[in-house]
């Protein structure tokens, strides 16, 4: 996903304003008939497929602003009630939870929230999980056997695995830290982070880390499941040097990460925004998203085209709703010298 800074976002806002003069984008005062503005941090192809399906089904146009989820959350917080956004779709739950904590999100229709398990949505009903991915360990089958894999996330960052593992400080990492905080405590999480810094190898992206494992550059890496499944669909799982591993039991390393969406309290087109959120959890909306990425649907009864194993076989002791904005995770990373 292309990185867009605040200046780029502001410049795109100017461009949007100019487009409104020529009928390309209708002004905010006409939002009730003009459609929706969605700030999007989720994978662009996924959201574009969802929006296309929604517009086809409803006739409601949706204008996208694409950037990294934390940047968009900060932008919305800065804009406050003046934000042109009606909706925010975040690749992870912490950025949208930060808006929840600031009181900037509106209530989602309870009938919509009832469509999916409560563990995938905010406890106060202000955001919902749209797709799910799991935290896993990607390992090279030629460099380590499943029997020799660590039995707990806490073994990473110890001398026993020095130089053998990689990690990525984004896209699921903060949730990983918060899970350890919830299960093991703050001191244990800080010690774990210091161990990662001392004994692990940092990669600038989960895809890069997964590729490094596949190519034999390193034995294993903490990652999200969908990078490996995308590669497996492309090349065939039987042809890969790497495989996925999950920790046994209720280990703190087992996490559900969700892409999450919510409606801004300041939206002037809330009826259409509620309709969009409901569509996200419909069969049509879910199928549009999971066709583009190896993430799980949150709606029961659907099958991913990426041949994902059942989520029933994966146990996570901490729910996405319990992760919060992950501000504690960032503080711990700074204290450990990782950022």
Predicted regions and their residues:
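Short, polar/charged alpha-helical segment
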Residues: 41-61
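A bilobed periplasmic-binding-protein/Venus flytrap-type ligand-binding module shared by bacterial periplasmic
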Residues: 138-143, 181-182, 256-269, 288
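A ligand-binding cleft/hinge motif common to bilobed small-molecule-binding domains
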Residues: 94-98, 220-240
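N-terminal export signals
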Residues: 8-28
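Short, well-ordered beta-strand elements
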Residues: 32-42, 61-65, 164
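Extracytoplasmic ligand-binding site segments that recognize negatively charged/polar headgroups
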Residues: 41, 45-48, 71, 83-218, ...
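Periplasmic-binding protein-like
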Residues: 133, 161-168, 193-196, 201-203, 238-265, 279-302
